[in-house]
Curated annotation (Swiss-Prot):
Localization per record: Secreted, Cell wall
Protein name: Cell wall mannoprotein PIR3
Domain of life of the source: Eukaryota
Species this protein is from: Saccharomyces cerevisiae (strain ATCC 204508 / S288c) (Baker's yeast)
Site (Covalent attachment to cell wall glycan): 76, 102, 120, 138, 156, 174, 192, 209
GO biological process, one term: fungal-type cell wall organization
Propeptide residues per the UniProt entry: 19-67
InterPro entries referenced in this protein's UniProt entry, alphabetically: PIR1-like_C, Yeast_CWMannoprotein_PIR, Yeast_PIR_rpt
UniProt record similarity statement: Belongs to the PIR protein family.
Any one GO molecular function term: structural constituent of cell wall
Length: 325
């Protein structure tokens, strides 16, 4: 895959040609290739949930409960590690962001990616929920939700280690799993929790076989999962291929290949700050690449666009609509 380089000449090193310097137009820091059918403008804010590439092929029959990425204060995005859920995916929780804008993944129950204060995106480690049993003995699994990635205060995005919802059993001994939903769950007057925009359930033909209907995605809105929104959830906007978080910071791949939010402008040395899209499958893409890497850092996973070490695993960043719960 070939990439565009900014029109600057640096005396430091040849590799600096692919990095951002403060005087450069950062919006040109984009891969040369684009994702076929990718959407570069999305009408509403959204989060991301972490989905391991190795397990995505089997997610139709047995999906994960996902937790959305969170964001801590520095802008890092974090994501939790997730376990596979018994039922088809339904509502998703978001990634969080920390204060410095970094995007990280924490060890989670299938929760959303968070963002810490510095803008990094991180994901947390997860746990699995136990199977329940109702009075007739049947075992059932509740509709799974995906938690959003969180963001800490520095802008990093992190994901926590996630838990998977367990199958339940009702009183007659049967083990059952419910269908998943895209929309947020509502509660009616008798106390039951219901979810709208459900995917079609499995049907049974005359010979007794159970078949599942293929899911059809809307080409104009490929995002088919929702998650509860909170203060640490990484909430992003996509316009003309540029990602911004709720503080207006720019989603970029920085010099160490980490995905985080800074600025504007992005931090010096940033490699990419544009060229983002949502794929027809509902995943976040950069250029023509829709896979990223979560790499363990203490209790959280930082997110990168390249494999940087032995503690890294290939993942999809699934786009999720965020709702108030």
């Amino acid at each position: 895959m070939q990439y565009k380089k900014p029109l600057v000449v640096s005396a430091l090193a040849a590799t600096s040609l692919a990095a951002y310097a403060p005087k450069d137009p950062w919006s040109t820091l984009t891969p040369s290739a684009t994702y076929k059918g990718g959407i570069t403008d999305y009408s509403s804010s959204f989060g991301i949930a972490i989905e391991a590439v190795a397990t995505s092929a089997s997610s139709v029959a047995s999906s994960k409960a996902k937790r959305a990425a969170s964001q801590i204060g520095d802008g890092q995005v974090q994501a939790a590690t997730t376990t596979a859920a018994v039922s088809k995916k339904s509502t998703a929780a978001a990634v969080s962001q920390i204060t410095d804008g970094q995007v990280q993944a924490a060890k989670s129950t299938a929760a959303a990616v968070s963002q810490i204060t510095d803008g990094q995106v991180q994901a947390a480690k997860s746990t699995a929920a136990a199977v329940s049993q109702i009075t007739d003995g049947q075992v059932q699994a509740a509709k799974s939700t995906a938690a959003a990635v969180s963001q800490i205060t520095d802008g990093q995005v992190q994901a926590a280690k996630s838990t998977a919802a367990a199958a339940s059993q009702i009183s007659d001994g049967q083990v059952q799993a419910t269908t998943s939903t895209k929309a947020a769950a509502s509660q009616i007057t008798d106390g039951q929790i219901q979810a709208s925009k459900t995917t079609s359930g499995a049907s049974q033909v005359s010979d007794g076989q159970v078949q599942a209907t293929a899911e059809v995605k809307d080409a104009n809105d490929p995002v088919d999962v929702v998650s509860c929104n909170n203060n640490s959830t990484l909430s992003m906007s996509l316009s003309k291929g540029i990602l911004t978080d709720r503080k207006g910071r720019i989603g970029s791949i920085v010099a160490n290949r980490q995905f985080q939010f800074d600025g504007p402008p992005p931090q010096a040395g940033a490699i990419y700050a544009a060229g983002w899209s949502i794929t027809p499958e509902g995943n976040l893409a950069l250029g023509d690449q829709d896979t990223f890497y979560q790499c363990l850092s203490g209790d959280f996973y930082n997110l990168y666009d390249k494999h940087i070490g032995s503690q890294c695993h290939e993942v999809y960043l699934q786009a999720i609509d965020l709702i108030d719960c």
